[in-house]
Regions:
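Intracellular coupling helices
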Residues: 4-17, 21, 280-321, 383-394, ...
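Membrane-helix entry/capping segments
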Residues: 6, 10-11, 46, 224-271, ...
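Generic structural signal for small/hydrophobic residues in well-ordered secondary structure
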Residues: 8, 18, 28, 32, ...
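Hydrophobic alpha-helical transmembrane segments of multi-pass inner-membrane transport and secretion
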Residues: 10-39, 259-295, 322-323, 402-427, ...
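Small-residue-rich transmembrane alpha-helices
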Residues: 27, 31, 227, 240, ...
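Mid-to-C-terminal secondary-structure elements
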Residues: 107-119, 132-258, 461, 465-644
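C-terminal transmembrane helical bundles of large multi-pass transporters
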Residues: 627-711, 715, 728-729
Length: 778
């Protein structure tokens, strides 16, 4: 080991490049490994995961309150049925303390479906009248005086009977209070109980079945029960079932924590690509430097060492080097984890644990990486015969195309990532600049819990008095943002209904948005609605202008009294992420002021000053009503609200950009190291060529040509891969850019600039060497 350390100290540049590259790559491998393990751990948190199913309609796992009644006690295969819902942004009063948190309303059977650990109390205590469990996090916030006081949420006064332990990675979202449906007194819950099958809400229904129940047969029996219950109702169509261990990555809406399978695959690929790039640097440099250790290994062979001894020595050195790199990589990963979590915004945050199972896994990673890193250099040096080293012929034999192949592979990775990042940036700007087809300039959208209080009138009047407010209207949604959707039956087809977004606003907001009226059928009233040109064609099967109708079936077998008052020009109601074959929209824009709707404010002057003024008024009235500041659901200018929809994609793009930068740096370091090695190896050759008439310029061109050929080869391989990958990326967007050739022209140009810039200085320095001084060294 002493000779190895001495060798590293004599080759500081190569050592630094290998160590930095491998440490950074291993940091991302560690992050990716923890991300993958912790995501999949969520799917396995319940030991009965293969016996529990979420049920819903058309892959939408939310139901009406009465869905539990449909299944409970009806089938011998079903052991338990539970229903529950999460209600966010609830004002919680405990004594003199106020909190804003999430309420979980459920039944006792909830404990059969989810792994919930109680620090205090027992599951059966939830059946007690007005009982509540609180989270460990909330319990820590309560002072001694509040701990014995009742807990008040809306119309419910509860007494605390237990504490739920804080969980790590889990399918359940964080919640602060758990209470029983049977004892809830709020208006919404009472309306569910009074009309259990009329209110479709964000309620999950889970069933637990006996072991070895056939899934298909169970689904048929559950569907039959639903057909009987909803035979005269249009609200229930095809039943869907998702097993517990499938929920986390399911495409269906569940109301629970969600995993991103696409990002999971991306993180795996990212970790592997960076590891491959760093390993190529390590292997390439060690193979190139084998000649510098040839005499040492020849001497060992001459004094009795076997080939296997040499191989094990190299593998041992690789293990030590990888172990130190891993320790540094672990520190880098620990430091980077908050940044990566912020970029990913995953429901299950990444952590870097140091428990025994993880330490064993880390050790296995070190062993595998060290084997991959050390086996090739070990095999090459072990094949060398001592006599070849003594004669000086070994260094000529070890020059193969391997180093060039590694450089090409490294640059292929970097080039593909550069093209992908350019495409992602262009697509992001394309979405942000997408016109909605309506006026959204200087419009501010404010939606909060004040919308449902008696304080709203005073709040609105104070807003009207602000100098920055020109006009104020009510609107339940805005264009360019996904909104409430209704089922709409096509008049010319027998197929299932189409789900159509609704924009509901008053006449003032209708004018603010600047809808273009194509045709008015008659007088408007609060119960009539506008329909877009595309919706006319889609619903009737005839182009706009070839039909005449005044009613639309909102539900199969049911005709509502609302009438079509006219046709408006098409506009963008959905965001750019959702792929749809049809772009239907209904607009209720004829009603008067709706006190339960959100606020649409037209402002004048500086946007930042206007936002500060509006926020100050909101905070004042919010604290007056609730005693605490409650974050509004919407609180920004309409164009900013639209742009915020793409925050997730923007953050993921920043992560890919970070990976791209690391990959390019690794590639650059590899080129610098190899150009330095090749320059020192070719110093004598260049000197001889200059003696026989070569010039500095000719030697620069000759040596640079070799790197240009390598980068050109990398581009030939990388560009088709990049084109395919970029096309796949863009397929996820309904509103997307064309994949222009200039993107790849810029990518190729950048790859050449990076490559030439990283090797040119070494080529120039060796080409300027005095031939006399170079030949003296020989």
């Amino acid at each position: 080991m002493k000779t190895y350390l001495k060798f590293l100290s004599r080759n500081k540049l190569y050592t630094a490049i290998e160590f930095v590259g491998l440490s950074v790559a291993l940091a991302f491998v560690i992050i990716s490994f923890c991300y993958v393990v912790q995501q999949y751990a969520v799917t396995r948190e319940n030991p009965d995961r293969e016996r529990i199913y979420a049920v819903g309609e058309n892959k939408n796992m939310i139901n009406c309150y009465g869905m539990k009644e449909v299944f409970d006690g009806k089938l011998p295969e079903v052991e338990a049925v539970s229903h529950f819902q999460f209600v966010q942004d609830q004002l919680i009063h405990v004594g003199e303390q106020n909190f804003v948190g999430t309420l979980l309303v459920c039944d006792v059977e909830f404990f059969d479906m989810f792994s919930v650990t109680l620090k205090e109390g027992a599951p059966g205590m939830l059946s007690e009248c007005n009982a509540a469990f609180i989270s460990e996090k909330l319990a820590k916030k309560l002072n001694e005086a509040s701990a014995e006081q009742p807990l008040i949420i809306q119309d419910d006064t509860l007494h605390i009977v237990g504490v739920i332990a804080d969980k790590g990675s889990s399918l359940l979202p964080d919640f602060d209070v758990m209470m029983n449906y049977e004892h809830a007194q709020s208006y919404a819950i009472q309306s569910y109980r009074d009309n259990p099958f009329n209110h479709w809400a964000n309620i999950g229904t889970f069933i637990k079945v006996r072991p070895d129940v056939d899934r298909e047969e169970l689904g048929e029996k559950l569907q039959a029960l639903c057909d009987v219950q909803f035979s005269n109702s249009p609200t229930m169509e095809e039943l869907s079932m998702v097993r517990f261990d499938e929920l986390f990555f399911a495409s269906a809406y569940t109301g629970l924590q969600k995993g991103d399978r696409s990002m999971l695959r991306t993180m795996i690929v990212i970790g592997l690509l960076l590891l491959v790039s760093a390993l190529l640097n390590y292997i390439n440099l060690n193979v190139a430097l084998v000649g510098k250790r040839a005499k040492e290994m020849a001497s060992r062979r001459l004094v009795g060492a076997q080939k296997s001894d040499i191989v094990w020595k190299f593998l041992g050195e690789a293990f030590v080097f990888t172990l130190f790199s891993f320790v540094v990589g672990l520190a880098i990963a620990y430091a980077l984890t908050p940044t990566v979590n912020q970029l990913l915004q995953s429901d299950v945050a990444i952590s870097i644990p140091f428990s025994l199972p993880y330490l064993v896994a880390y050790l296995l990673i070190v062993i595998v990486v060290s084997l991959l890193a050390g086996i090739l250099p070990a095999a090459i040096i072990a094949k060398a015969q001592p006599i070849d080293v003594v004669r000086g012929t070994f260094r000529f034999r070890n020059r193969t195309v391997l180093s060039k192949v590694f450089i090409v592979v490294q640059n292929v990775i970097a080039i593909v990532l550069i093209a992908l990042v350019l495409t992602m940036e262009l697509q992001m700007h394309h979405m942000e600049d997408r016109p909605t087809g309506l006026n959204v300039e200087n419009l501010y959208f404010l939606g909060s819990d004040l919308d449902y209080t008696d304080e709203k009138e005073a709040f609105v009047e104070e807003l009207r008095a602000l100098p920055c407010v020109k006009e104020l209207a009510s609107a339940q949604s805005i264009p360019g943002v996904m909104s409430m959707r209704f089922g709409l039956k096509k008049l010319h087809e027998t197929e299932p209904k189409t789900y159509v977004p609704i924009l509901n606003c008053d006449t003032v907001a209708f004018r603010m948005f600047g809808f273009e009226v194509k045709e008015r059928f008659g007088d408007t009233d609060a119960h009539s609605f506008w329909i877009t040109e595309t919706t006319v064609a889609g619903m009737t099967g005839l182009p706009y202008g070839d039909n005449n109708f005044d009613t639309i079936k909102m539900w199969e077998n049911h005709t509502i009294g609302n009438t079509v008052c006219g046709v408006i020009a098409d506009f963008k109601m959905q965001d750019a992420l959702h792929v749809t074959d049809e772009d239907y929209v209904l607009v209720y824009g004829n009603g008067g002021w709706n006190p339960d709707s959100h606020l649409l404010i037209e402002v004048a002057g500086d946007h930042r000053e206007a936002k500060r003024a509006i926020d100050a008024v909101y905070k004042k009235h919010c604290e007056k009503v609730f005693g605490i500041y409650m974050e509004p659901e919407f609180d920004d200018f309409v164009d900013n609200v639209i742009a915020k929809q793409y925050d997730k994609h923007r953050r993921q793009m920043r992560l890919i950009e970070l990976i791209m930068a690391v990959s390019v740096i690794l590639s650059l370091l590899g080129l610098v190291a190899m150009s330095t090695h090749f320059a020192s190896e070719r110093e004598k050759t260049i000197a001889i060529r200059k003696v026989f008439g070569g010039t500095m310029q000719s030697e620069i061109r000759r040596n640079l040509k070799e790197y240009i050929i390598m980068i050109l080869s990398a581009n030939v391989i990388a560009i088709p891969v990049a084109v395919w990958l970029c096309k796949r990326y863009l397929e996820d967007f309904a509103y997307r850019i064309d994949l222009h050739p200039w993107i790849f022209v810029v990518t190729v140009a950048l790859s050449f600039v990076i490559a030439i810039g990283s090797v040119l200085w070494q080529i120039v320095s060796v080409a300027r060497v005095n031939p006399v001084m170079a030949l003296k060294k020989e």
